[in-house]
Amino acid sequence: ALGVQEAAWLFGHSDGASIALLMATRWPQRVQGLVVMAPHLFVEDVTVQNIERAREAYEQTDLRHKLGRYHDDVDSAFWGWNRIWLDPAFRTWNIEPEVAQIRAPVLAIQGCDDEYGTLAQIRGIAQRVPGTRLLELPDCAHSPHRDQPDAVVAAAVAFIQAHHTPA
């Protein structure tokens, strides 16, 4: 509908980063490169523990109100996310085999203090996708774009400039 023919650069955070990685495996001709922040390749105990804490915060604090600034249907957004991650059947979710198919350049960014995943997530990308550049940010939690915006923007701009191929 938009008439966009050029392969796109995908920039995703958290579950959105995982979706970007999956798009690059399914439609490689549509993806020129990826910048992923705090992606999930597999489920870790720390992820589940902190998503349980998020549920408690949603029920007992003003988290629902805060999230309402970003979501029209905050309950649907929160509970859809929370329930899938806490479903015991989801514990086996793993996209590592799919990620190994990626051939586009990848910049993978993770906060060293990420409460929803360890550095094993982005290191797993580097083990599977040749040429992946890692940016592990100290004093940074799950939202590098919020916690260290200057570092994220500088790294992303430099990476895209180094790998962008004009149409």
Predicted regions located by residue number:
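Conserved hydrolase catalytic core segment
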Residues: 6-44
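A short beta-to-alpha transition loop/helix N-cap that caps and shapes the active-site region
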Residues: 40-51, 116
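Active-site nucleophile elbow and catalytic-triad environment of alpha/beta-hydrolase enzymes
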Residues: 81-98
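Catalytic active-site module of serine/aspartate enzymes centered on a nucleophile-bearing elbow/loop
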Residues: 132-133, 138-167
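Alpha/beta-hydrolase active-site loop
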Residues: 1
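Conserved alpha/beta-hydrolase "acid-adjacent" motif
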Residues: 115-121
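Short beta-strand/loop motif that positions the catalytic acidic residue
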Residues: 102, 108-110, 114
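A catalytic-pocket lid/entrance helix-loop region that shapes and gates access to the active site
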Residues: 47-72
